[in-house]
Design a protein with these regions (language model features):
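Interhelical loop and adjacent transmembrane-helix boundary motif
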Residues: 134-184, 188
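Cytoplasmic-entry segments and transmembrane alpha-helices of multi-pass inner-membrane transporters
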Residues: 17-51, 96
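C-terminal transmembrane helix and the adjacent membrane-cytosol boundary/short C-terminal tail
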Residues: 85-96, 100, 104-115, 164, ...
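Single conserved hydrophobic/aromatic residue that forms the stacking wall/gate
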Residues: 1-12
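Membrane-interfacial helix termini and adjacent extracytoplasmic/periplasmic loops
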Residues: 29-30, 46-75, 107, 143-146
């Protein structure tokens, strides 16, 4: 759970700022950067896992918490960028401009005007990052181990090595958690529209 919590928090800061920057930029640069942020979705997960393993072997990050969190965050970043960018499309930037014309700095205007108005996409993005980390088994098989084996890796190993009803119970709980988070997200977005 600690991997998913850290991944959820770490994954949201950079992509939220990236989506905001892409939204405010003009020209060709936003399209190129947007494609860059989507690369982990475009490349097959097994190739990302092998590449991550080889890179981590050279850097000494295999079987470390920092390595696992970084790998999980890399896989979740595209989902956060897409979700926040779609939320920013319906946001009127004139509101932030007004705040800045009244003396607020750009960071203060973003934190006090823009961020509260895009909170539903931000919360949804955080939940997606959490669920992505929860579900990411391919990369975990390559970079996690020892004291830092993720729950999904332990479940995969248990399914492979032993027959235990605990895995079925945990899987049911994970599905129920995912459905509950999805329902909460839908309920929150309906409340926001009204």
């Amino acid at each position: 759970t600690r991997f998913r919590n850290v991944t959820g928090v770490q994954t949201c800061a950079l992509p939220i700022l990236a989506a905001y920057s892409l939204h405010t930029m003009s020209g060709r640069a936003p399209r190129v950067l947007y494609a860059f942020f989507l690369m982990p979705l475009i490349v097959p997960a097994i190739l990302v896992a092998i590449g991550t393993f080889l890179l981590y072997a050279q850097l000494g990050l295999n079987n470390t918490m920092a390595g696992i969190v970084l790998a999980h965050a890399t896989m979740a970043i595209p989902l956060v960028v897409i979700t926040v960018a779609s939320g920013l499309k319906s946001y009127d930037m004139n509101q932030e401009m007004v705040a800045r014309s009244l003396g607020a700095s750009r960071p203060r205007a973003f934190l006090t005007v823009t961020l509260p108005q895009i909170r539903i996409p931000v919360v949804t993005a955080a939940l997606l990052a959490f669920i992505t980390s929860l579900d990411e088994v391919t990369i975990s098989l390559f970079v996690a181990g020892g004291d830092y084996a993720t729950m999904t890796k332990r479940m995969f190993n248990a399914l492979r090595d032993e027959i235990d009803p605990t895995i079925a119970a945990i899987s049911t709980l994970l599905v129920a958690l995912s459905v509950a988070l999805l329902a909460a997200s839908q309920f929150a977005s309906r409340g926001e529209r009204r």
